[in-house]
């Protein structure tokens, strides 16, 4: 931001400088915005005017996207899709859920107050606990085998069923998810079932 009083520039940190980012309708964003989001997701930093700013930890990005058939959407680059741990496809809401949505969003109801249930330090501590969950070499090999099985030529009969094989990053995410599943199940070790569940 230019300051006309003294001719100086200062950085104004935008909404991406948060612990939790919700990128709504990410595939409606133009390529330049998607590229900026890709940098922050990969590098955990933002570059403004040649200067880099590290993101505070923990840093998490959630995103929504519209069906690609809808007008005004852009396909997400594979490099960006690969940065997300998982994709959850949500069905339409039930009748009761849709009524509650209508009442809440189109009615005169005040939005409920939201209180923090965990601090950034709490989330960092939980991450450390999850990362300390033991994964035997056999489980790690299982995860690598699952990831490699998605690639062209890996298994007979799979050609044409998988659009793009999983990257090495998919194995990393699957290990993180399996550890989290084991942790939430009250165990300090990972089983192949934890990975299958994801």
Where on the chain are the PLM-derived regions?
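Canonical AAA+ ATPase core
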Residues: 4-6, 25, 29-33, 41-135, ...
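Glycine/charge-rich, flexible interdomain linkers and switch-proximal surface loops
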Residues: 12-15, 56, 158-165
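Conserved alpha-helical scaffold flanking the Walker A/P-loop in AAA+ ATPase domains
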Residues: 2-22
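Basic, amphipathic alpha-helical bundle interface domains used for macromolecular binding and assembly
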Residues: 106-198
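Short aromatic/hydrophobic contact patches that present stacked aromatics
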Residues: 20, 87, 163
């Amino acid at each position: 931001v230019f300051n006309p009083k003294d001719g100086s520039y200062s950085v104004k940190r935008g909404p991406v400088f948060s612990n939790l980012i919700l990128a709504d309708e990410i595939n409606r964003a133009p390529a330049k915005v998607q590229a900026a989001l890709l940098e922050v997701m990969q590098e955990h930093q933002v570059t403004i005017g040649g200067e880099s700013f590290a993101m505070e930890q923990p840093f998490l990005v959630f995103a929504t996207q519209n069906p690609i058939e809808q007008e005004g959407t852009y396909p997400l680059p594979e490099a960006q899709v690969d940065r997300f741990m998982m994709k959850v496809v949500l069905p339409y809401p039930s009748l009761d859920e849709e009524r509650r949505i209508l009442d809440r969003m189109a009615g005169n109801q005040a939005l409920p107050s939201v209180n923090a249930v965990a601090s950034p330090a709490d989330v960092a501590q939980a991450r450390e606990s999850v990362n300390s969950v033991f994964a035997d070499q056999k489980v790690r090999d299982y995860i690598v085998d699952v990831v490699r099985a998605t690639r062209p030529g890996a298994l007979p009969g799979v050609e044409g069923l998988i659009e793009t094989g999983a990257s090495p990053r998919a194995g990393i995410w699957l290990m993180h998810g399996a550890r989290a599943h084991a942790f939430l199940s009250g165990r300090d070790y990972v089983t192949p079932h934890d990975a299958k569940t994801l």
